[in-house]
Amino acid sequence: MQPPPPGPLGDCLRDWEDLQQDFQNIQETHRLYRLKLEELTKLQNNCTSSITRQKKRLQELALALKKCKPSLPAEAEGAAQELENQMKERQGLFFDMEAYLPKKNGLYLSLVLGNVNVTLLSKQAKFAYKDEYEKFKLYLTIILILISFTCRFLLNSRVTDAAFNFLLVWYYCTLTIRESILINNGSRIKGWWVFHHYVSTFLSGVMLTWPDGLMYQKFRNQFLSFSMYQSFVQFLQYYYQSGCLYRLRALGERHTMDLTVEGFQSWMWRGLTFLLPFLFFGHFWQLFNALTLFNLAQDPQCKEWQVLMCGFPFLLLFLGNFFTTLRVVHHKFHSQRHGSKKD
């Protein structure tokens, strides 16, 4: 090989030789990466199929145990109960395992994203995504408080109201997508607290299309005041729930992927019961909104279909939020009373 010519060209050629050597190392590293990736895919497929087989056999075993339990002698009941407990524990272990394996997206994610794999493969990535979701909720809640306050007390314009409602539609749509991804990654979000975001998306979309007029102006201030109060309560919930979750995770009593929610769950009983009056007041305000809209719909001057279409979601939100919260409170009172009787 000829020596490089002197001067700037020689320096460039020497740099190119160094780059060539580095590139060969990169090629080898990339080749190993692709091999490991293929091995990982095979392991994922094997693990998924093994878990599927185990779950199917567990279901068959649970059915057989259920059939034979009535005819068991008294001395065998303890062993049957122990077996049931172990099977439930196994189901929980499978849930944790599947959080690290690729899975098919649900209907909603398939419609929005297609068949893209949204499973994050490391604890750090899962926790970082969950943390980013929590921060997103916090920042948007603060923004919603400020905008609803501005629309309620400073500006009376259908344009700014429409911008506020558009922000609500975008916020709730984004929440539903992010929550679906978090569920795919092991977050245990209860059914209603996910579904009520779909209802809120529909409600905000209808509010966005409601034209300015007499009926809209009659309901406008009430809706903006409610939105301001709701965002304030959501801010309180995030602030106190995040601290409570941090303590419970440190004690090993909560899962690392558990989230703050816009409601009340059993783990909040210790230290967060002071939020209940705020929540119940908000629930009954939703009922008041529904009744107001149903009353407006009976007005002879009411021509807009949006009046009734907003009333029904508010009623559904009240029923879902109120009875879900009430069920949690009733369950905790019942379990505490049962525990005190045992003592």
UniProtKB/Swiss-Prot annotation:
Q: Which family does it belong to?
A: Belongs to the TMEM120 family.
Q: What is the lineage of its organism?
A: Eukaryota, Metazoa, Chordata, Craniata, Vertebrata
Keyword Transport carried by entry: no
Listed A to Z, the keywords are: Cell membrane, Endoplasmic reticulum, Immunity, Innate immunity, Membrane, Nucleus, Transmembrane, Transmembrane helix
Note the topology in the membrane: Multi-pass membrane protein
Q: Where in the cell is it found?
A: Cell membrane; Nucleus inner membrane; Endoplasmic reticulum
InterPro entries reported for this sequence: TMEM120A/B (IPR012926)
Q: Which GO terms describe its molecular function?
A: coenzyme A binding; monoatomic ion channel activity
| Residue ranges crossing the lipid bilayer per the database entry | 133-152, 159-177, 191-209, 219-240, 271-294, 305-330
- List the stretches on the Cytoplasmic face of the membrane: 1-132, 178-190, 241-270, 331-343
Describe what happens upon changing M207A. Increases membrane pressure-activated current
Miscellaneous information on this protein: TACAN means movement in Farsi.
The record describes its quaternary structure and partners as: Homodimer. Forms heterooligomer with TMEM120B. Interacts with PKD2; TMEM120A inhibits PKD2 channel activity through the physical association of PKD2 with TMEM120A. Interacts (via C-terminal domain) with STING1; regulates the trafficking of STING1 from the ER to the ER-Golgi intermediate compartment to elicit antiviral effects.
One GO cellular component assignment for this chain's record is: plasma membrane
What would be one Pfam family of this protein? Answer: TMEM120A-B
This protein's domain notes:
The transmembrane domain (TMD) has structural homology to the very long chain fatty acid elongase 7, ELOVL7, despite low sequence homology between them.
Q: Source species, please?
A: Homo sapiens
Gene name of the encoded protein: TMEM120A
**Name of the protein this chain belongs to:** Transmembrane protein 120A
Might you name a Gene Ontology BP term for this protein? detection of mechanical stimulus involved in sensory perception of pain
The free-text function statement in the UniProt record for this protein reads: Multifunctional protein involved in mechanosensation, and plays an essential role in lipid metabolism and adipocyte differentiation. May function as a potential ion channel involved in sensing mechanical stimuli. Mediates the mechanosensitivity of the PKD2-TMEM120A channel complex through direct physical interaction. TMEM120A seems to affect mechanosensation by inhibiting PIEZO2 channels, possibly by altering cellular lipid content.
Q: In which tissues is it expressed?
A: Expressed in nociceptors.
Name the predominant localization.
membrane
Concerning PANTHER family, the annotation shows:
ION CHANNEL TACAN, TRANSMEMBRANE PROTEIN INDUCED BY TUMOR NECROSIS FACTOR ALPHA
Residue ranges in the Extracellular topological domain are 153-158, 210-218, 295-304
